[in-house]
């Protein structure tokens, strides 16, 4: 194929990617098996055809398939793939008829026009939002360190409160929220379109902060209060203090211990990891419950944000317990590398998680920054079925405002926040891959998942079991 043909094909693919995935609405990567899809749906369809998979739907065979819940029902996802024309025998883009290509380009133009209209509408909002953030340079959160330094000696966490339902990681006290999240009575309400922070050029860079003022109704006192509350909540709900992590840094699993992990059955190691993930999620739930702004959201939105974002926060927090010098992570009291998780049969998931942790560590985030970024990831207005997405969005904007100031105080690199925001799709992708791997594991070991996995884990990542497999 000559150079001009390659360029034409690349240009065509780039144009096609303007159209969202026809299956789940995520960002598409081109035409796969005859339909415009994302990489996730392409891989799902390929695996379903290779394995001649037979899926069943536990509900009424009319499950909604979108970016957030596409992994919840494989039957309905596959049926949607087939209904929209996905096929192993589908023609490739270059072999389409002129009529098919014209129809496709008309759709591309329609989406491009819609995006242009959205950008014009958002530009006014971007200017207003930039004004909200702008005075962080001159006013800042100067009192933040002064007020927190007296509470946390040497920047380390104070002892966890010995309240009922919460415990120190090494104590024998009960875990929080063992009963899981109450999802009864949730109505599926169509999410209204919202403003995407990441789509606005230079919004979070230093140069976008001029001599503006806070938007009406927002004060620096409020931003300061939110930041202090989030940082305090984070420090009080981390499984390990930084001091403890430093002490454990070179406590690594021995060769014999690593061999023991590798010789475990796939079922046993999956169960072990599910327990550890659930343990970490319980701390994230407690973190969220201590955030004042989060608790002011309606209960429906609190639950939806936790269900869709808790694992993402666990992944962000993982960087605290990751040693980039030898690529090891803290697991069951000692550090170990990727080879420890070989028995899972999910090397790609483990690789992605480790790569993300290493990349996040390279930014050398402080505890303040991890706290604020974690809360921004959790309190995300683009989650499906939120009742009050605008309220969630406003809270997230205030968190990003505080985070931007803290970053500018700690880093010479003006682009640290932009780099953090750019990592959010990777966080989502790793968590989606976890969901896909769990579904594959469940197909071959349904009884293990149904009877031995923690109830909270099942409720969050395997909702079919949470309701019918107690």
From Swiss-Prot:
Gene Ontology terms describing biological process: amacrine cell differentiation; cellular response to retinoic acid; eye photoreceptor cell development; negative regulation of DNA-templated transcription; negative regulation of osteoblast differentiation; positive regulation of DNA-templated transcription; positive regulation of transcription by RNA polymerase II; regulation of circadian rhythm
InterPro entries: NHR-like_dom_sf (IPR035500), NR_DBD_ROR (IPR044101), Nucl_hrmn_rcpt_lig-bd (IPR000536), Nuclear_hrmn_rcpt (IPR001723), ROR_rcpt (IPR003079), Znf_hrmn_rcpt (IPR001628), Znf_NHR/GATA (IPR013088)
Segments of this protein annotated with the region Disordered: 104-127
Domain NR LBD: 222-460
Coiled-coil regions listed: none
Motif window: AF-2: 456-461
CDD domains per record: NR_DBD_ROR (cd06968), NR_LBD_ROR_like (cd06939)
DNA-binding region: 18-93
Pfam families (alphabetical): Hormone_recep, zf-C4
UniProt feature, compositional bias: Basic and acidic residues: 104-117
ZnF (NR C4-type) intervals: 21-41, 57-81
Location of this chain's protein in the cell: Nucleus, Nucleoplasm
Residue spans crossing the bilayer: none
Superkingdom to which the source organism belongs: Eukaryota
Principal location class: nucleus
Keywords: Activator, Biological rhythms, Developmental protein, Disease variant, DNA-binding, Epilepsy, Metal-binding, Nucleus, Receptor, Sensory transduction, Transcription, Transcription regulation, Vision, Zinc, Zinc-finger
A single cellular component GO annotation: chromatin
Disease linkage: Epilepsy, idiopathic generalized 15: An autosomal dominant form of idiopathic generalized epilepsy, a disorder characterized by recurring generalized seizures in the absence of detectable brain lesions and/or metabolic abnormalities. Generalized seizures arise diffusely and simultaneously from both hemispheres of the brain. Seizure types include juvenile myoclonic seizures, absence seizures, and generalized tonic-clonic seizures. EIG15 is characterized by onset of variable types of seizures in the first decade of life.
Chain's role: Nuclear receptor that binds DNA as a monomer to ROR response elements (RORE) containing a single core motif half-site 5'-AGGTCA-3' preceded by a short A-T-rich sequence. Considered to have intrinsic transcriptional activity, have some natural ligands such as all-trans retinoic acid (ATRA) and other retinoids which act as inverse agonists repressing the transcriptional activity. Required for normal postnatal development of rod and cone photoreceptor cells. Modulates rod photoreceptors differentiation at least by inducing the transcription factor NRL-mediated pathway.
PANTHER family for this protein: NUCLEAR HORMONE RECEPTOR HR3-RELATED, NUCLEAR RECEPTOR ROR-BETA
Subunit structure: Monomer. Interacts with CRX.
Family: Belongs to the nuclear hormone receptor family. NR1 subfamily.
Domain remark in the UniProt entry: AF-2 (activation function-2) motif is required for recruiting coregulators containing the LXXLL motif, such as NCOA1, and control the transactivational activity.
Name of the protein described by the UniProt record: Nuclear receptor ROR-beta
Protein source organism: Homo sapiens
